Amino acid sequence: MTLPNWPRIPPAHGAIQLRPIERRDVDMARKLSTDPYVPLTGSLPGNASKAEASSWVRRQQGRHAEGRGFSFAIARQDDDYAVGHCGLWLKDLDTGRATAGYAIVPSDRGCGYATDALSALTEFGLSIPEVLRIDLYIEPWNIPSLRTAERGGYLRGQLVVGHQAIGGRLRDMIEYSIWRPIDD
């Protein structure tokens, strides 16, 4: 599948801009890896060494070329310092659907960065003509992420039983969705 091009202007909202992952984001990756949950959800090892974090950065840099989607650093607009990671994943683009995910480094949580990042990611995602809907899948216990989804304009849907393997176990997830506005 051929993906849409990278945005010429970085998606931005509030205090955050989304930019491609760069080598300088190794420190951000290492900080993310200290959250015990983050390594369970992707390819970043827990308490990653510099070499492991560098390898993760390289993998993220290849996601677009592999046809998976867009892997962004969440960076503060005022100094371009990366405070997290988010992705718009397009494996179901042929059906008009995308999925998104986001994570903020533990030391920068509670500043509204996740909501700003999700808003920027959503606006970008819905600007892609083929994307009609973006879904988030969040574990029911993850109250901060549930609130971020709601602040980002996503509507709570159903509990999807056994939706995703996390840490080697199928987990129930709450589906949140947002749709492209219908033009009259």
Residue ranges of model-derived segments:
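A generic secondary-structure signal
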Residues: 59-63, 124
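Conserved GNAT-fold acetyl-CoA-binding loop/helix
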Residues: 37-59, 70-72
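Acyl-donor (CoA/ACP) binding surface of acyl/acetyltransferases
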Residues: 1-36, 71, 75-184
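Hydrophobic residues in alpha-helical segments
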Residues: 33, 42, 64-65
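Short loop/turn motifs at secondary-structure junctions and domain boundaries
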Residues: 62-67, 154
